[in-house]
Amino acid sequence: MSEILELEAESRTEFGTGAARALRRAGRVPAIIYGAGKTPVSISLEEKEITKYYRKPAFISQLINLTIDKKKYKVLPKAVELHPVTDIVRHVDFVFLEEKTQKMEVPVVYEGKERALGVKRGGYFNIVKRRVTLLCDVNNIPRNVTIDVTNMPMATSLKSSKIELPKGCSFVTKKEFVLATIIGRRGAKTEAEGEQQAAEAGK
């Protein structure tokens, strides 16, 4: 589960390009919070702080307690705009969390893919899904979905129905889908092909 990040923000009442530039010159980043049937709230964040957290893994699935004018709101990052050259955060969209569950796009970590059985036999580990969309309990939002693939053999597919998700999470789609495959490289032999050729050579 993601640890809850504590951030402070300030309300803003001036809008438009000029106001945004003035904020950035002052070392702050314009942002907005919306969703859950609430009136959108325009805020600003300290630039160095939000850029530091954005550069950490899985920021987009990070649960945040955002303090605005001494009031706390539970939010999630929705979209981040970056400077095209410096990668400094220029604007952030957040969503309010009021429901018990939240739809989330979460990174997938394929643990042991370099040493998977099929890869050791000359196969290629092909990633089909780098992120998956989950329905999660707001108090149990994972940073990622980690899947151990060390025992995955050649010419097989890793399907969603075989994945054990973190507690309180489920796939949004009920339809089965493929996350990864191990396919043979050109010139690579499967174990069965190798045995067959050895048997023929011994005749």
Curated annotation (Swiss-Prot):
Gene Ontology biological process: translation
InterPro entries registered for this protein in UniProt: Rbsml_bL25/Gln-tRNA_synth_N, Ribosomal_bL25/Gln-tRNA_synth, Ribosomal_bL25_b-dom, Ribosomal_bL25_C, Ribosomal_bL25_long, Ribosomal_bL25_short, Ribosomal_L25_dom, Ribosomal_uL5_bac-type
Q: Which domain of life is it from?
A: Bacteria
A GO CC annotation recorded here is: cytosolic large ribosomal subunit
Q: Which UniProt keywords apply?
A: Ribonucleoprotein, Ribosomal protein, RNA-binding, rRNA-binding
Molecular functions (GO terms): 5S rRNA binding; structural constituent of ribosome
Q: Which Pfam families match?
A: Ribosomal_L25p, Ribosomal_TL5_C
Q: Which CDD domains match?
A: Ribosomal_L25_TL5_CTC
Query: What PANTHER family does the record point to?
Result: RIBOSOMAL PROTEIN L25/GLN-TRNA SYNTHETASE, ANTI-CODON-BINDING DOMAIN-CONTAINING PROTEIN (PTHR33284), RIBOSOMAL PROTEIN L25_GLN-TRNA SYNTHETASE, ANTI-CODON-BINDING DOMAIN-CONTAINING PROTEIN (PTHR33284:SF1)
Whom does it interact with, and what assembly results? Part of the 50S ribosomal subunit; part of the 5S rRNA/L5/L18/L25 subcomplex. Contacts the 5S rRNA. Binds to the 5S rRNA independently of L5 and L18.
- Spell out the family assignment given in the record's similarity comment: Belongs to the bacterial ribosomal protein bL25 family. CTC subfamily.
UniProt protein name: Large ribosomal subunit protein bL25
From what organism does this protein derive? Rickettsia peacockii (strain Rustic)
Q: Which gene encodes it?
A: rplY
